[in-house]
Amino acid sequence: MNLKDIAKIINSDFSGEYFEITKMNTLRDATKSEISFVANAKYIKEIQNSNAGAIIVSKDTKEFVPSGCVALVVENPYWEMATLSKYFAPSIEDETLPEPKIGEGTTISPRAEIARGAIIGKGCTIMAHVYIGTNAVIGDNTIIYPSVTVYRDCRVGSECIIHANTTIGSDGFGFATNKQGEHRKIYQNGNVEIEDNVEIGSSTTIDRAVFGTTLIKYGVRIDNLVQVGHNCVIGEHSVLVAQAGISGSTTMGRNVVMGGQSATAGHLSIAPFTTMAARSGVTKSIDKSGLTFAGFPLLEHRLWLKLQAKIARLIKQN
């Protein structure tokens, strides 16, 4: 899409050199042929270091756009990013793509549907009512149980097991809101990648990234009814127990354990070998590895146990 057309769509005055923009991306990852945005002044350093060809900004952050990068000034960058995301959304299905490629020894139920452009490796088992989307890739020896959906462009590694009714790559919960309180969808144009030797329980949802990838690393174990938000990274051999909820853009180190019904806020970082007891609520990043936490507000587990004992004594005294 030409930058001239983009400027018109988002109502930005621009009179510089026009060139083609191929996709939207983050400030950190965007290249000269890509466009990004900034909706918060706390990302000034990221603006200054960005290699994006163009950045959607407010008048307050325009001055921080580096030379050689086009600043598209608008009143509400987040809203206009949402507007533009629709124009870069790929087709849900593409009939021009080749027929799916199926590896040797793979068994596919006649009641499953495999979209064009998909690739399924050797020795897989694909059961009834499974849908594998356009350009999705399934590795070797992976088992996919009934009614699983793997959306377009998503990748599942080898030796994985995905249980019934799980959804891989549905849209993340992303929308912009204007001054009038109206909402506008942010089209989620990234994907999900699940590395090798991952097992995912029934009725779990892993959302696709806005840009880039939601990543489930090697050896992760995910229980039933777990929600993983867009752009999350779940570290190697981590364990997410039933009804855990991981908000968008949270990054976990390896061997993190999230107990049942525990949850995180978004945009957090959790150190390796951290354990959250059931129903823990994580609102801040955890930098020190190897600790166990419980409760809400979150406390180290031993302090939480002491607090519960004191509360019990107070109740007994009264």
UniProtKB/Swiss-Prot annotation:
Q: Which GO terms describe its molecular function?
A: N-acyltransferase activity
CDD domains assigned to the protein according to its UniProt record, in alphabetical order: LbH_LpxD
- Keyword terms of this UniProt record: Acyltransferase, Lipid A biosynthesis, Lipid biosynthesis, Lipid metabolism, Repeat, Transferase
EC class of the enzyme, as a word: transferase
- Provide the active-site residues from the annotation: H230 (proton acceptor)
| An individual GO BP term | lipid A biosynthetic process
**Which residue pairs form cystines in this protein?**
none
EC number(s) recorded for this UniProt protein: 2.3.1.191
Signal peptide span: none
What does the record give as its pathway? Bacterial outer membrane biogenesis; LPS lipid A biosynthesis
Q: Which reaction does it catalyse?
A: a UDP-3-O-[(3R)-3-hydroxyacyl]-alpha-D-glucosamine + a (3R)-hydroxyacyl-[ACP] = a UDP-2-N,3-O-bis[(3R)-3-hydroxyacyl]-alpha-D-glucosamine + holo-[ACP] + H(+)
One GO cellular component assignment for this chain's record is: membrane
- Pfam families found in the cross-reference section: Hexapep, LpxD
Role summary: Catalyzes the N-acylation of UDP-3-O-acylglucosamine using 3-hydroxyacyl-ACP as the acyl donor. Is involved in the biosynthesis of lipid A, a phosphorylated glycolipid that anchors the lipopolysaccharide to the outer membrane of the cell.
Q: Which family does it belong to?
A: Belongs to the transferase hexapeptide repeat family. LpxD subfamily.
Question: What does the record note on quaternary structure?
Answer: Homotrimer.
What is this protein's name?
A: UDP-3-O-acylglucosamine N-acyltransferase 1
Q: From what organism does this protein derive?
A: Sulfurimonas denitrificans (strain ATCC 33889 / DSM 1251)
